């Protein structure tokens, strides 16, 4: 409750700052600054036929499904919340060097120590001038355009999905683009601690260098193709003075290929096929839903009995967004993540997750959306034969708002 009160106070402070900024915006004139205020209020209600970690009651994450029978109690739960609701401000300010672009964006979905809470959470705090950008925003290693038109919050588990602190250089901008960035190492999308699988007492993970990421997107008439990559260095130190030497290091790497293919329809919006395939080692914290980056390997050496190994991971995403008309749409698809566990990992360690959904959404008027969605997820353990399924039906209603102050 204390953390929730702190989060609410922080949110109130940001609201005060927002209104002060709005009061300072000058009347509309040529070349004047501009603020775009936007967001939405969103209600989620649904029924979960199985069970999962109660801290993640309103999302479908295969890693949070039970690792053994009735780990989280009995099956069947009703859930509801407004945690997807969002508030953001984008600023545009002319300077002698070009236009400064900034984004501050928050939502109410608590993660990390606030997992399960309705509390303010920072999504973006990012600024850009010319070909350089800095702050917290989408990692160049990910492609946000792969995310389907769905109402389940967490999204496809096999997708690379991470808003990270970074400094980026963008030599090519526009529909065809190129980005190179150095990123904060060791963080994760759900703000949990970095997990190396070497949590023995006295063994501490260290990141001597930032992660290096890059993307190149080539646009064409029907969409685009994007290739992204990442390199990272992970080290762990043995801080206990004994007969064992548990120090080590590993290089992590990954390649992510993604695409959107647009299909003309009679509706105002085009249908879209969204595809992604990623493979790498030691990059699990960049995935939308995956466990440890480093696994334990038993060596048989009396001095170094265990070592670390960057775990290979494969992620796939395939979704189709279809517009029946200007007022009705459907999204359906499948995603999976496959981890190759190390020999020293427990039999009930997470090895593979599946995710699928189908929905029918209705847009009665501009800025209003409502609809229902069926969701399915599955967890498969490493070596004990255990699988756990989850089935959900969710209804959501979303009300957008936006307003521009200043500008021409």
State where each predicted segment sits:
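Detector for outer-membrane/organellar transmembrane beta-barrel domains
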Residues: 222-350, 407-408
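Sec/Tat signal peptide C-region and signal peptidase I cleavage site
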Residues: 25-30
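Sequence/structural signature of outer-membrane beta-barrel proteins
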Residues: 48, 94, 109-113, 139-154, ...
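Outer-membrane beta-barrel "beta-signal"
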Residues: 388-408
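Bacterial N-terminal signal peptides that target proteins for export
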Residues: 2-15
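Outer membrane beta-barrel
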Residues: 31-57, 63-64, 68-189, 206-224, ...
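Bacterial N-terminal signal peptides
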Residues: 13-23
